[in-house]
C-alpha cells in the first residue's frame, strides 16, 4: 500500500553545464528521501531542458537521477514541455529512449493521458502529449485519485509577479482527491473542486536570475493524514540579484539582495 509520496519537479538538466552542482544537491536529497522511506517518488515533468537535443553527458545524468530514485522506491515520471517537441509529435521525446534502454521495472513513465492503477492509488494522468486534455475517468471511491499535471494553472503566479489568468481551468481537476503539478517554478498551493488541493511544487533547484533563491525544494505527501509538507532544499551556488545606486554601495557593503 502506498502511504508516503515524494514529489519533485522541473530539474531542467542541461546538456553538459551545472551537472556537478546538481549532483551535489541531488545527493543530499536522495539521502533525505531514503531516510523518509517513501513508497513512491513522483516527478512532474521537465527532467531535461533542451527538448530533444541530447549529449552523452545529459544521458549519463538522466540515467543516474532515475537510477538513484528507483533505488529508493518505485518512481513515476511525467512528461514536461521541455522533454519533447510539442509542435512535432512525430519526433521521439528525450526520455523514452533512455527509460526504454534502462528497462528498470521501478521506473514508470506516464507519457500518455489516462488512468494508471497502482495499489491503493489511481494516477489520473493529464498529458501534454494530448494537450493536457482531461482524461476520461470516473473517480474510484475505494482508491485515492491523484492527478498528475504539467502546465500553468489559473491563479498561479511566477516569482516575477506574472499571473496566469488564461492558465488551465481548475474545474478540469474535478474528481481528483489532490493534484501533484509541475511547470511553474514557484511553490504554490491552489484550491480545486470539492475543497481539494493542487500542489505546484516548484523547481527543485533555482534555475536563473528571474527566480527567488528560497522556496525551492520538494514535497512529502502523507496519504493517511492527507498532509502535504514542503521541504526547502539548500542551494550553495544560487543566482543572486543585487540592487545598488552606484559603486560606492558595493564598497560600503550597502548593496541590497532583491531575490532572496
What would you call each of these model-derived segments?
Residues 159-225:
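Conserved beta-sheet core of the metallophosphoesterase superfamily
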Residues 6, 122-124, 219, 238:
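Conserved beta-strand elements of the Class I
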Residues 116, 198-260:
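Binuclear metal-dependent phosphoesterase catalytic core
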Residues 83-171, 201:
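Conserved catalytic scaffold of divalent metal-dependent phosphoesterases
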Residues 2, 11, 15-115, 172, ...:
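Core catalytic region of metal-dependent phosphoesterases/phosphodiesterases
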Residues 10, 45-46, 80-81, 150, ...:
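Active-site glycine-centered loops adjacent to acidic/histidine catalytic or metal-binding residues
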Residues 3-5, 39-40, 121-122, 144-146, ...:
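Structural motif
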Residues 75, 145, 228:
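Hydrophobic anchor at the start of a short beta-strand
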Amino acid at each position: 500500500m502506498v502511504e508516503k509520496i515524494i514529489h519533485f519537479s522541473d530539474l531542467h538538466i542541461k546538456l553538459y553545464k551545472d551537472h556537478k552542482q546538481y549532483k551535489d544537491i541531488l545527493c543530499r536529497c536522495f539521502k533525505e528521501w531514503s531516510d523518509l522511506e517513501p513508497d513512491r517518488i513522483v516527478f512532474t515533468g521537465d527532467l531535461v531542458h533542451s527538448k530533444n537535443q541530447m549529449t552523452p553527458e545529459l544521458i549519463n545524468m538522466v540515467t543516474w537521477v532515475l537510477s538513484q530514485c528507483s533505488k529508493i522506491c518505485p518512481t513515476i515520471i511525467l512528461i514536461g514541455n521541455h522533454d519533447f517537441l510539442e509542435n512535432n509529435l512525430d519526433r521521439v521525446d528525450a526520455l523514452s529512449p533512455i527509460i526504454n534502454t534502462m528497462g528498470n521495472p521501478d521506473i514508470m513513465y506516464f507519457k500518455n493521458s489516462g488512468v494508471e492503477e497502482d495499489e491503493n492509488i489511481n494516477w489520473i494522468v493529464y498529458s501534454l502529449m494530448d494537450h493536457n486534455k482531461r482524461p476520461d475517468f470516473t473517480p474510484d471511491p475505494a482508491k485515492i485519485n491523484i492527478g498528475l499535471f504539467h502546465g500553468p494553472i489559473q491563479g498561479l503566479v511566477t516569482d516575477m509577479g506574472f499571473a496566469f489568468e488564461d492558465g488551465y481551468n481548475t474545474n478540469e481537476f474535478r474528481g481528483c482527491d489532490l493534484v501533484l503539478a509541475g511547470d511553474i517554478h514557484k511553490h504554490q498551493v491552489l484550491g480545486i473542486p470539492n475543497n481539494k488541493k493542487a500542489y505546484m511544487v516548484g523547481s527543485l533547484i533555482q534555475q536563473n536570475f528571474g527566480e527567488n533563491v528560497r522556496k525551492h525544494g520538494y514535497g512529502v505527501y502523507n496519504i493517511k493524514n492527507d498532509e502535504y509538507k514542503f521541504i526547502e532544499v539548500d542551494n550553495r551556488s544560487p543566482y543572486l540579484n543585487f540592487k545598488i545606486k552606484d559603486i560606492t554601495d558595493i564598497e560600503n557593503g550597502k548593496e541590497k539582495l532583491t531575490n532572496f
